[in-house]
């Protein structure tokens, strides 16, 4: 029995505390709202529902002054501005999207341009032949009339196909055998003219050289070149001949064409001469004025 009584007392105490908390919370909320509006607070009620005038005092209402109201309201200048995150607008997103689309587009060469109607019109020239004019008129009359400002690529291609120059038939060599003969004759004459021009140039240079009378100067220069070449050959010939002599000399092979030993090869050792030296370097002996019989230079 004592346990049941204690439990009932505890439940009554907890319920009474809950009701007191609800009343105090409602009164505090009402007081705050009335204080902001400048209305005096009504008399308080206790837990039993009696007014506070039974206790002998009335709480004075608290009025809110303008200065206190300003102090209560926060100032916008005191608020912190958050600049860590970038401000994104729909316009900036659109620009970023357009830039991304441009980068993803495939490359197109600027040199590949379609033919414009103006260029096609300038390429078209009036035909000189009457027959071609008549044929063009008949072809164009059957086609529908289109505005020149609205020319399509198909119409441009059609105009290019229809146009035929009358001069192209005349220049075609297969059309006329006489033209082929004339062209071949023209090529031969041009070749002869070029040969004659070259001969004329050489004759003019020879005439200029003869007119200057430079033969004496040329003879002196030739003799000067021969003397220098002979001196160089003498300087190079001596050490080379000495080396060949120490190596055993020069062997010359001869094929026997007569007698018992016909067909056999016979080797003969000879001395190294100036003529061999000059021939080995590819210099003609007569150009250096060398006498092979005497083994000396000609004067």
UniProtKB/Swiss-Prot annotation:
Residues 17-32 have a biased composition (Basic and acidic residues). It is found in: Cytoplasm; Nucleus. Belongs to the SFR1/MEI5 family. This is Swi5-dependent recombination DNA repair protein 1. Residues 1-16 have a biased composition (Polar residues). Its main location: cytoplasm. One of its GO terms (biological process) is DNA recombination. Residues 177-236 form a coiled coil. It comes from Schizosaccharomyces pombe (strain 972 / ATCC 24843). Keywords: Chromosome partition, Coiled coil, Cytoplasm, DNA damage, DNA repair, Meiosis, Nucleus. Involved in DNA recombination repair and meiotic chromosome segregation. One of its GO terms (cellular component) is nucleus. InterPro entries: SFR1/Mei5. Pfam families: Mei5. Residues 1-52, 132-152 are annotated as: Disordered. The lineage of its organism: Eukaryota, Fungi, Dikarya, Ascomycota, Taphrinomycotina. Interacts with swi5 and rhp51. GO terms for molecular function: ATPase activator activity; double-stranded DNA binding; single-stranded DNA binding.
């Amino acid at each position: 029995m004592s346990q049941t009584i204690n439990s009932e007392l505890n439940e009554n105490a907890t319920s009474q505390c809950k009701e007191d908390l609800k009343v105090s919370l409602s009164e505090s909320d009402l007081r705050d709202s009335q204080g902001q509006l400048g209305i005096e607070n009504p008399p308080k009620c206790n837990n039993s529902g009696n007014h506070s005038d039974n206790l002998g005092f009335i709480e004075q209402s608290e009025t809110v002054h303008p200065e206190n109201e300003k102090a209560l309201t926060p100032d916008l200048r005191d608020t912190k501005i958050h600049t860590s995150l970038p401000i994104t607008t729909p316009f900036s997103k659109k620009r970023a999207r357009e830039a991304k689309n441009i980068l993803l587009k495939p490359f197109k060469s600027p040199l590949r341009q379609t033919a414009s109607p103006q260029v096609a019109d300038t390429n078209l020239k009036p035909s000189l032949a009457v027959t071609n004019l008549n044929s063009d008129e008949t072809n164009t009359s059957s086609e529908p009339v289109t505005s020149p400002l609205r020319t399509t690529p198909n119409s441009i291609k059609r105009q290019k196909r229809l146009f035929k120059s009358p001069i192209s038939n005349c220049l075609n060599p297969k059309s006329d055998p006489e033209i082929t003969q004339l062209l071949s004759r023209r090529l031969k004459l041009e070749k002869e003219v070029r040969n004659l021009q070259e001969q004329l140039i050489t004759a003019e240079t020879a005439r200029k050289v003869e007119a200057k009378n430079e033969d004496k100067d040329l003879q002196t220069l030739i003799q000067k070149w021969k003397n220098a070449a002979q001196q160089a050959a003498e300087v190079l010939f001596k050490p080379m001949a000495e080396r060949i002599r120490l190596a055993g000399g020069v062997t010359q092979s001869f094929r026997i064409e007569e007698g018992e030993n016909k067909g056999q090869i016979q080797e003969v050792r000879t001395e190294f001469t100036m003529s061999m030296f000059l021939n080995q370097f590819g210099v003609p002996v007569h150009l250096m004025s060398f006498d092979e019989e005497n083994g000396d230079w000609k004067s």
